[in-house]
Amino acid sequence: MNILYLINYAGKAGTEKYVLNLMHILSAQGETCHLAYNVPGQLSETVSSEGFACFRFEMSTKKAFSAAKKLAGYCRENKIDVIHAQYPMENVIAILSRLFYRKVKVVYTSHLTIYQNTKWKILNRLFTPFDHRIIAVCRQGADIMISNGVKKDRIQVVYNGVEPKRERVYD
């Protein structure tokens, strides 16, 4: 499977560590991982130095259709199966990219625990029904997503963003 991680700022905070961990875990399992970003930083440098494919392009809400078209072109060219968006803006662009390349599925992980303004609540109501999966990294994050316009039944909480292997229980 070809997975593209989509993040605006490829810096060095918790979300970036989450993306890097997933890229390491899934590439070790034989998946092909790509990183698409707007603003370079430690994550993009690390990922590039480790040999992962990287794609830098301009992303903004004002130029969402242009960004979506560029993203779709990259996905088509690289036969991307899944776009994993990390924040609301990236999610909107990923969903819009499906207008130009329908084969891709979109997974959205919310790392935010902030209440959004009316504009984003409306955008969440319009766009999140098209996500194939929506992940919150904590219960509070899920509750805030609901208040931000995401339907409760669409959200799955995966603590720390990576589902751990279940330990065998001995009686």
Q: Model regions: which residues?
A:
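Membrane-interface segments of envelope glycosyltransferases acting on lipid-linked substrates or membrane lipids
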Residues: 1-171
